[in-house]
Amino acid sequence: EKSAQARAFAKEHFNLDVKPHTALKDFAPGSFDVITLWHVMEHLEPLNETWETLRSLLTEKGVLIVAVPNCSSFDAKKYGAYWAAYDVPRHLWHFTPGTIQQFGSKHGFIMAERHPMPFDAFYVSMLTEKHMRHSCAFLRGMITGTLAWFSALVKKERSSSMIYVFRKKGGEKGIRD
């Protein structure tokens, strides 16, 4: 975890010893079968080095699961620069399904699966409406969230956030929705 405050919260409330992201270098290559990053990748730098480190830490059949906001989503397009999931300056990177697949490929991964996170659109839309100081922000956010949810039912790549499952190249091939 990059945030010292989040690490302290995890320790205080759950007695978890959460390490900073810089501790990745302390693990031996091939230490993990699965690594998960739930809304973390967009915060990490340097990005290329991080992908290489994650790859080295996985076993040969290891899996990398990454959940990130989708800047080509229905709600991102509706709100434009006001979209709350841009979360500048905390979000250093913004991904589309295509760009994250390219990053994975560049660093020796194939995208094995991708899944929408349909409920993120409700939260992000409500937060965006609140930040824009619109009246009835909750209601407006729920309406946009509902429209975004239906849009993602038709085309998963329109989901506000996506979960991507990567495998090292040489393992399972192709994308499964």
How would you name each of these model-derived features?
Residues E1-Y79, L92-F109, F119, S161-K169, ...:
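Conserved SAM-binding loop
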Residues E113-D177:
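A C-terminal cap/extension of S-adenosyl-L-methionine-dependent methyltransferases
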Residues V18-P20, A85-Y86, R114:
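Short hydrophobic/aromatic-enriched beta-strand-loop microsegments
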Residues E1-S3, D87-L92, H134-G145:
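Short, Lys/Arg-enriched charge-dense amphipathic segments
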Residues Y79-V88, L127-H134:
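Short glycine/proline- and charge-enriched loop/turn segments
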Residues P69-S72, K77-A81, Y86, L139-G145:
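Residue-level signal for well-ordered alpha-helical segments
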Residues F9, I65-V66, A84, H134-R140:
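N-terminal start-of-chain detector that recognizes signal peptides
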